């Protein structure tokens, strides 16, 4: 068994945190035989199979697969105080990766950046396969980044896949009405198949690292609000939400957007969508000031907007993500707004755990 994984620099309580991990993960069986699950991440993959044996399964019905990311409107009145409180809540680092994480990720080992990119792509594929809400994929990547900002996983391949599966499982439990089984989640391009117990233990590890704070503020929290500001008559709301959702999903590939808060990403995405659909909004500081939203960082939104325009116009992975997700939701644009359930088609055959 290898040495414990190295925690991210700057975390004074990381040693205590690892002790908590060991306590949580050893209570379900004798500590002498269980050992440290976090240490096991250094070694061979536990309880996995690369068997060619296959079985078929039908993807469960998506729970309200709507382009607004699952933040369904219930005649909510957006008061100045409510919006200001939401924007103020973004400053809580407990719901975001460590402030130094984006820089460390971009300047660190290329393998870490590549592993994150692979995990993001996998999460988006599974989200597409099961018709999950956009916010589910966004939260899964957010949980993954928050965990990685605190702990560095070994470069053995399977540990990162285990983290991605775990974060998507947690996000699905938070947002989806019908959650695919652990085995079904791993059917899409999975190199390893993990047992339910392994995923459960990793969930405890992630939950403790995130201080059990899973209900996070996301760009989808603000999507309808900003769309209403751009199109108060509601003539283009469906298209605005649909296009802004695709842009937002594309941003999770690009680590540059880790430097931007959810409200800035949401506002910039809506403005990008409006420039494509309506061609009416002139993007400048005055436009954003006219929204009269307390706490909104107009300059940050303009920077994020320009970055998004580069992302959309380029041929990088972000654009590919937009094209993939566009294909997914084109056929459900109408049902997205009406929040009707959409049943996914049966997925292809998959491997099963031996």
UniProtKB/Swiss-Prot annotation:
The keyword ATP-binding does not apply. GO terms for cellular component: cyclin-dependent protein kinase holoenzyme complex; cytoplasm; nucleus. One of its GO terms (molecular function) is cyclin-dependent protein serine/threonine kinase regulator activity. GO terms for biological process: cell division; G1/S transition of mitotic cell cycle. Keywords: Cell cycle, Cell division, Cyclin. InterPro entries: Cyclin, Cyclin-like_dom, Cyclin-like_sf, Cyclin_C-dom, Cyclin_N, Cyclins_cyclin-box. Transmembrane segments: none annotated. Coiled coil: none annotated. Belongs to the cyclin family. Cyclin D subfamily. It holds the Pfam family Cyclin_N. It comes from Oryza sativa subsp. japonica. The gene is CYCD1-2. SMART domains: CYCLIN, Cyclin_C. Residues 37-74, 331-354 are annotated as: Disordered. Residues 44-66, 331-346 have a biased composition (Low complexity). This is Cyclin-D1-2. SUPFAM superfamilies: Cyclin-like.
